[in-house]
Amino acid sequence: MARIAGVDLPNKKRIEYGLTYIYGIGLYKSRQILDAAGISYDKRVYELSEDEAAAIRKEIQEHHVVEGDLRKQVAMDIKALMDLGSYRGLRHRKGLPVRGQKTKTNARTRKGRRKTVGAATK
């Protein structure tokens, strides 16, 4: 099992799909990394030699932001929006959808479980 960027890649998958288990690497970026390292997409993770794994590690470390650094960067970007007081920052702070979705009936994932209002007795 190859360990790249702190993530254990599944042995039986093709390397182009195995790299997508790393946060911040999708299929397109995975193929870019493999092209730069000179490795075939068809190779399985368990077939990688130590030199090939090192080439992938080097490419990711030098040219891509992944895993913890990327998570930290995203969190800081969201915090900056909230500190600015922008509309998007306010939506993040209130836990509501940020990208313009309607909230009268939907948005249950962001808003949480329903809170019943107005069932008071006289």
From Swiss-Prot:
Sorted alphabetically, the keyword list is: Ribonucleoprotein, Ribosomal protein, RNA-binding, rRNA-binding, tRNA-binding
Q: Please give the GO cellular component terms listed in this UniProt entry.
A: cytosol; small ribosomal subunit
- Biased segments, Basic residues type: 95-116
Tell me the InterPro entries matching this sequence.
Rbsml_uS13_C, Ribosomal_uS13, Ribosomal_uS13-like_H2TH, Ribosomal_uS13_bac-type, Ribosomal_uS13_CS
Is-annotated flag, keyword Nucleus?
no
One Pfam match, given by its short name, reads Ribosomal_S13
Show the segment(s) annotated as Disordered. 95-122
Claim: rRNA-binding is one of the keywords in the record: yes
Q: How does it assemble?
A: Part of the 30S ribosomal subunit. Forms a loose heterodimer with protein S19. Forms two bridges to the 50S subunit in the 70S ribosome.
Its recorded name reads Small ribosomal subunit protein uS13
Task: Supply the source organism for this entry.
Answer: Campylobacter concisus (strain 13826)
The gene behind this protein is: rpsM
